[in-house]
Every structure is written in C-alpha cells, then in structure tokens.
Amino acid sequence: MLSPAPEEPLLLAELKPGRPHQFDWKSSCETWSVAFSPDGSWFAWSQGHCIVKLIPWPLEEQFIPKGFEAKSRSSKNETKGRGSPKEKTLDCGQIVWGLAFSPWPSPPSKKLWARHHPQVPDVSCLILATGLNDGQIKIWEVQTGLLLLNLSGHQDVVRDLSFTPSGSLILVSASRDKTLRIWDLNKHGKQIQVLSGHLQWVYCCSISPDCSMLCSAAGEKSVFLWSMRSYTLIRKLEGHQSSVVSCDFSPDSALLVTASYDTNVIMWDPYTGERLRSLHHTQLNPPMDDSDVHISSLRSVCFSPEGLYLATVADDRLLRIWALELKTPIAFAPMTNGLCCTFFPHGGVIATGTRDGHVQFWTAPRVLSSLKHLCRKALRSFLTTYQVLALPIPKKMKEFLTYRTF
C-alpha cells in the first residue's frame, strides 16, 4: 500500500502572541503545547507568560487549504446560527506546559456541571485542562472561558494531560514529580489513582482511543504501558537510548509511537510489546563538528486522523511527514525552534508550536484511504493483536492486520 508522493507542507498561517510591555519576551515565551478540540471547533495554544489562547476554528477563509473549504464553511455557518464564539484569553497564573480538550461529554455530565456550577451557562460542556508549572491543573469551560476547578496533588510541573476519548471525563496528568495521576471530573475533580514507577521526569501520557491502555514516557529511556481498567502496569517497553518525550496511539489503538532525544521514533505493537520499526531522523545538513550530537533530538510525534501518516518535530529545524510503510520521510518543511505538533481532527492541517511562542499551520497529506486500510482500521478498533492471531485466516492476512506488512 504505497502512498502517493505528497506535496511539501505549505505554511497556511502563523499566529504570534501580543507583546505587552510588562513581559520579558526573551524568557518563558515558549509554546509548549497546542491542541484542537475533538470536534475541530476550537484551537488552544499556550503562548507563554501564563497565557492560553482559545481560538474558534476555522481561521479566516484565506488560511483554509484546498479540499478543506466545504467542511470548514459548514462548521462556521452552524456556529453562527447559535451565536458566534469569540477568541478567549485564559490567564493561568503560571507557565502552561500541557493542554487537553475533553471530548463532548454525555448529557448526564452536562447536567452535573450545570448543577455544581450554576454560574456557568448551560450552553456547552467542552472543557480545557491546563497543566501548570507549580503542579496545579486548571479546568476551564471553553464556551465561556470560566475557571471551573483547580486540581492539586502534583509536586512539580504538570508536563502533559490526556482525557479518555469516551467522554467519561477521566483525566490523566503526567508530571516532573515522576508520577501520573488519574482524576474524575464527574466527581468534582476527585483524584482516584496515583501511578508510580518512573525514576525520572514523566514527559508525556496518551490514552488509547479504545480507552484500554495508557502510555507514559519519562527521562530514564523507559516507556510504560498501564491498564486503564485496573490502573496497573502492563509492561515496560525498552529500546530508546535517551529520554522519551512524546507518544501517541494510532486511531485504531493497534500501534503506539514514541519519540526520543536519541533521534528515533519507535513504532510498537502495544499488545505484545514488539518493536515493529524505527524511524531515524538523519540530518539533512550535518553539523560542522561532532560536539552537536543531539541536533536532531525529537520533540514531538503524532498520528494523522486516518492513521496512515506521522508528523514529527525535531531540533534540526524540520517538520517531517512520514508514511507508516516507509522508513524515510515523504515530506519536509523548515521550521525554527519547534516544540510540539498536532493534526487537525479531520485531517488536512498540522499545527506546530515554537520556542518563541508562535503557532504555525501547515498543509498535511490528504489521501483517500484504501478499502484494505479501512477494513483493517475497523477490525483493529475492537480486536487485539492476540485475537487477530487466533483467527482462522491466512498468515499474510494476519501480518497485514497486525501492521507487520502494508
């Protein structure tokens, strides 16, 4: 299943923070995290100096790529029908490291929020969690910009956040205090579990789309897989040679990718722990001397919504696009001081954040998934690797369904 050669990513738009005179813009201005809401209606951006911007999506029409117009205009018209949302500025009081939108919760959750927070208009229950420098987590109502909850427990920077995709309002936080914590926002933000075992800072966390597994990665080269049902450790994944700083599950939960300062992305089978392939980030322009050995250190990795591509950001000033079946990138884009990346939920756009507080939006490959891939994705959404291997089907079909072949 070879993908057609895509065009190089094109820069669609760049957002820059305002520059109030009281801020020293030479420090604490990093965009450590960017996020789209699961329905694609909002974009959040930690622009440094304790500020998060909430921006209705899509942006102005001139920034919308070809093939994206119809869906975007429909979304915009629907939004206008119920009152146009406006850009919001959230002052979090501390440097913001992690961001996560909740999925749209079920109606019972909506009533719970309205009952316990009568000051919040009952118009939307989309919420945003922000992880702060002092270990606090702040929970915001997106439509109004109101602060709903403060979650306390971590003793150091909250580096990453992840909501269960099911809409249950279970939140996982990863911290430099070497722990992960599980919070139930349906119970006033009650802390229901602390996961320990990492020996160094926990950089990232990701919950599988089927809500069965949690991945966490830390500074001791380790990747941990946890059960989201029992909150116990399933296995450790060994293979990286330096700190692991980013992780993401494929849309069907069948694959896990991890990115490290060792310049490699490793693709794993999370059910078996098998290492399927490595994607090495070779510098296009080698350094002038051997002292700069970490110039290709990775910062972020993410899956595309259809599960056919990966995007990575590295210290060598490149955004790379990878096809799963290939070991070399299929496209590059130059970007300076990149820190994070994420795909738009409906595809076609990649957002990246930089050290100077900027956000850039790039075109992403838009391809029609093959029927084979769609069938594999549908099956793997509810079948584990072991269940696939137990099926009475030919070996080649098992290899395809378990991503050993493409």
From Swiss-Prot:
Keywords: Repeat, Ubl conjugation pathway, WD repeat. GO terms for biological process: intracellular signal transduction; protein polyubiquitination. Transmembrane segments: none annotated. Residues 358-406 form the SOCS box domain. Residues 70-89 are annotated as: Disordered. SUPFAM superfamilies: SOCS box-like (SSF158235), WD40 repeat-like (SSF50978). WD repeats lie at residues 107-150, 153-193, 197-236, 239-278, 293-332. It holds the Pfam family SOCS_box. Pathway: Protein modification; protein ubiquitination. CDD domains: SOCS_WSB_SWIP (cd03733), WD40 (cd00200). PANTHER family: WD REPEAT AND SOCS BOX-CONTAINING PROTEIN 2 (PTHR15622:SF1), WD40 REPEAT PROTEIN (PTHR15622). May be a substrate-recognition component of a SCF-like ECS (Elongin-Cullin-SOCS-box protein) E3 ubiquitin ligase complex which mediates the ubiquitination and subsequent proteasomal degradation of target proteins. The SOCS box domain mediates the interaction with the Elongin BC complex, an adapter module in different E3 ubiquitin ligase complexes. This is WD repeat and SOCS box-containing protein 2. It comes from Bos taurus.
